[in-house]
C-alpha cells in the first residue's frame, strides 16, 4: 500500500522556440508518464497539446504513455516536427549547389 510519504517530485517540461514551461508534480510510485502530464495540467497553458497522440520522453528518450516514471526522472512533452528533415536537408543541398558551394554532380564540397 502506498501513502503520501512515498510521493516524489517529477518535472514536466514543454518548450516552444520562444518559451518553456516546467511544472513540478508530486506523484506516487507507479505513476505513468501520461498520468503525470495530465496531473501537471500543462494543457491549460498550451492547448495545442493533444494528450492522445503527443510524444513523451524521459531525458531525450521517447517513452510510451504507460511508461512508469521513477524518482529523479522528468517527463518531456515533444512537439511535432514542422518540416520533414529529409526535405529540409535536400533543399539545403540544392541551395548549396546553386550557390557553388557544392559540386553539382556529387554534392560534395567544391575544391
Curated annotation (Swiss-Prot):
Region of interest called Disordered, as start-end residue ranges on this chain: 88-111
Transmembrane segments: none
Gene3D superfamilies: RnfH-like
Pfam families: Ub-RnfH
Superkingdom of this protein's organism: Bacteria
Family: Belongs to the UPF0125 (RnfH) family.
Matches recorded under HAMAP family: UPF0125_RnfH
Protein name per its UniProtKB record: UPF0125 protein SO_1475
Amino acid at each position: 500500500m502506498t501513502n503520501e510519504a512515498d510521493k516524489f517530485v517529477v518535472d514536466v517540461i514543454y518548450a516552444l522556440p520562444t518559451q518553456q514551461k516546467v511544472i513540478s508534480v508530486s506523484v506516487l510510485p507507479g505513476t505513468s508518464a501520461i498520468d503525470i502530464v495530465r496531473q501537471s495540467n500543462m494543457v491549460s497553458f498550451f492547448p495545442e497539446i493533444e494528450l492522445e497522440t503527443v510524444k513523451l520522453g524521459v531525458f531525450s528518450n521517447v517513452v510510451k504513455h504507460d511508461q512508469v516514471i521513477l524518482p529523479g526522472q522528468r517527463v518531456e512533452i515533444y512537439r511535432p516536427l514542422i518540416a520533414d528533415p529529409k526535405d529540409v536537408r535536400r533543399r539545403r543541398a540544392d541551395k548549396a549547389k546553386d550557390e557553388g558551394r557544392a559540386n553539382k554532380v556529387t554534392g560534395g564540397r567544391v575544391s
